[in-house]
């Protein structure tokens, strides 16, 4: 499945001697109880190729993408044995995600002015931020496709967290394969988390 592919691809891309996985525990980023307990998730991660599994504290795992990412980077940096950080995304290029992360980190005046103008329209902060980024980067079509995807949003926050924490970790983007976020189907053995949960609920395994 996707996580197994991610683990193997990450180790390959990094030329890693070992792999550390930081995963949420019994509660997910949506604030819901995980469909399997944290011990089962850790066991599956080890079976998939991880050498060490560390729980992302609930304080981070149920929080925003920004806090989720900051927690993960903080843990990996604190180990002093990790030099690369692999994350999943649906974007085609790491550079595209980095462009956005740089704006969010630097907060240039042009961007903040547009953001302030968008917020005055009464729209939500996430929507105002998305609009401001697209207008500031001057490529609405290109960045709309990136910013409209939850996996990309988390990837951007990881990249921003690396900058915020002045981390030495080298970012490695693993492109999502076959099935996109929230797709309820299986393609060549790949399924989204939503699809897997649905299969388990319907006991079609």
Predicted features, each with a name:
Residues 11-12, 46, 73, 77-78:
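Non-catalytic positions within long, well-ordered alpha-helices that form the structural scaffold/packing
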Residues 43-57:
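A glycine-rich helix N-cap at a beta->alpha junction
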Residues 1-38:
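N-terminal catalytic cores of NTP/NDP-binding nucleotidyl/phosphoryl-transfer enzymes
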Residues 55-205:
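Active-site cores that bind ATP or allylic diphosphates and position pyrophosphate for catalysis
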């Amino acid at each position: 499945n996707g996580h197994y592919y991610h683990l193997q691809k990450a180790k390959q891309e990094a030329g890693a001697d070992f792999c550390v996985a930081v995963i949420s525990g019994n509660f997910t980023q949506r604030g819901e109880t995980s469909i399997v307990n944290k011990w089962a998730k850790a066991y599956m991660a080890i079976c998939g190729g991880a050498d060490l599994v560390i729980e992302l504290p609930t304080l981070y795992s149920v929080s925003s993408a920004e806090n989720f990412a900051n927690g993960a980077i903080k843990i990996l940096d604190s180990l002093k044995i990790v030099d690369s950080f692999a994350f999943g995304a649906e974007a085609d290029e790491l550079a595209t995600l980095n462009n956005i992360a740089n704006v969010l980190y630097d907060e240039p005046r042009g961007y903040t002015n547009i953001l302030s103008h968008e917020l005055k329209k009464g729209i939500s902060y996430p929507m105002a931020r998305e609009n401001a980024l697209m207008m500031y980067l001057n490529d609405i079509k290109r960045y709309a496709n990136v910013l409209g995807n939850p996996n990309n949003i988390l990837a951007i926050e990881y990249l921003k967290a690396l900058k915020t924490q002045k981390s030495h970790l080298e970012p490695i983007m693993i492109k999502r394969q076959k099935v996109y976020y929230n797709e309820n189907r299986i393609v060549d053995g790949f399924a989204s988390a939503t699809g897997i949960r649905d299969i388990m609920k319907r006991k079609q395994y």
